[in-house]
Amino acid sequence: TKILDQDYNDFSKNDTIENNDHFVNLNSLFLNSGFKIIIKNNNNIKIKISNIVTDDDLTIFQKNNIICEEGSSLSLIEEYENKNNSTSNILNVIKLEKNSQLNHFLIQDNSPNHNLIITSHSSCKKDSTYTQKVYNFSEGYVRNFHYSELIETNSEADLQGIFFLKDNNTSNNKTFVKHLAEDCKSNQVYKGILNDRAKATYFSNTHVDQVAQK
């Protein structure tokens, strides 16, 4: 399915992702791949995607659009298991319509020479739930920055991650949830195990807009 400009309207007009995020800006500037998934009304679907780069010295700029229509449910597994010398810059733009659910699993197990920069922006309408679980086993650098907006009542976002780092590896992690309506719920938890000289950062933030405060 062709990706249209309007698929990114919500994303492009919001200020949840910083305008000076140069990785996101580079993704838009040098975009060279992407996919679009639409789960139709009231469908229950399971999908597994293996993101594999076959050649060395490549930089993948990939922008994906995932839409769950009203009453639908999607279980999505994304695997990143690259063993070559390349870089993947991924942006997922996710929309959940009323009463929809998305369980999103990100499995990251790359070699020391493969860098993964992954950013996501999810927007949740009334009674929808977005659950994201990140598993980082990579030996190469990984940046996980994930943002969610709860734009209508009774919507939920649950952003969780776990990372296992060793040697001189580094990982940067960030989650940010905006409550833009009343009676919404969110959860942000990242945990990690570091050995040797490995380093990691994690920043989480929850913003409750005035209109969402009772």
What does each of the following model-derived ranges do?
Residues Q6:
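Acidic-histidine catalytic/liganding microenvironments
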Residues I3, K13-K214:
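Conserved beta-strand/loop scaffold segments within soluble protein domains that form the structured core
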